Amino acid sequence: MSILTQEALLVRDALSVRGLENPLIELNINHKIRKRRIENHMRAIVHLLNLDLEHDSLLNTPKRIAKMYIEEIFSGLDYSNFPKIAIIQNTMQINEMITVRGINITSTCEHHFIVFNGKVTISYIPEKNVIGLSKINRIVQFFSKRPQLQERLTKQIFLALQTLLNTDNVAIFIDAVHYCVKARGIHDVSSTTTTTALGGLFESNTNTREEFLHAIMYCNH
């Protein structure tokens, strides 16, 4: 069993208390066994699609999918993969908005297991803590590597940053294209979905909120 970092535990517990964790169940199965079982199930699915698993192009497809699920696109379900984060005391007393724009995300819609992708803008105003800028990107990537709802993904990143930074002053905006809308069903190739979460001064202070909204508009042009 993997030992989780203090930061991973803090975030996991915060999400659980707020009812924002993915609908997980406890399975005491190691990754090797998980991959083997997923491979077997994928083999059955491919077979039921009348595809020849002995063909060169399909021979290793079930194994590839199992490896991809566990090690890549759903790796965020395992908190042992939570990014290593050093919480830095705000000794420089930074009190201005810090913004990271244009963070690319690729996630998987949990309704159809089809990709959605887009861009994220995140701002925060430090109080006691700051973190390295790249850690914000890594937190975004961690939570995107799950079967997701965009609404939940937004809230998970938002609360994770509030928890680690020990401040309510966090804002997040996600603009994404959902391929369950684009590639099936209504086949709408041009619509996007936006979600926003505002906390602290971003919610209560009009000027702070407008500065964040300006950052979003700048990113989208």
From Swiss-Prot:
Q: Name one GO cellular component term.
A: cytoplasm
Kindly give the SUPFAM superfamilies that the UniProt entry links to this protein. Tetrahydrobiopterin biosynthesis enzymes-like
Alphabetized, the UniProt keywords read: GTP-binding, Hydrolase, Metal-binding, Nucleotide-binding, One-carbon metabolism, Zinc
GO molecular function per UniProt: GTP binding; GTP cyclohydrolase I activity; zinc ion binding
What's its catalytic activity? GTP + H2O = 7,8-dihydroneopterin 3'-triphosphate + formate + H(+)
Q: Report residues binding Zn(2+).
A: C109, H112, C180
Signal peptide segment: none
**Would I find Metal-binding among this entry's keywords?**
yes
Pathway(s) served: Cofactor biosynthesis; 7,8-dihydroneopterin triphosphate biosynthesis; 7,8-dihydroneopterin triphosphate from GTP: step 1/1
The biological processes this protein is annotated with in GO are: one-carbon metabolic process; tetrahydrobiopterin biosynthetic process; tetrahydrofolate biosynthetic process
Which Pfam families does the entry link to?
Answer: GTP_cyclohydroI
Q: What is its EC number?
A: 3.5.4.16
Instruction: Report whether Ion transport shows up as a keyword of the record.
Output: no
Coiled coil located at which positions?
Answer: none
Assembly and oligomerization: Toroid-shaped homodecamer, composed of two pentamers of five dimers.
Q: Which family does it belong to?
A: Belongs to the GTP cyclohydrolase I family.
Q: What is this protein called?
A: GTP cyclohydrolase 1
Lineage of the species this protein comes from: Bacteria, Pseudomonadati, Pseudomonadota, Gammaproteobacteria, Enterobacterales
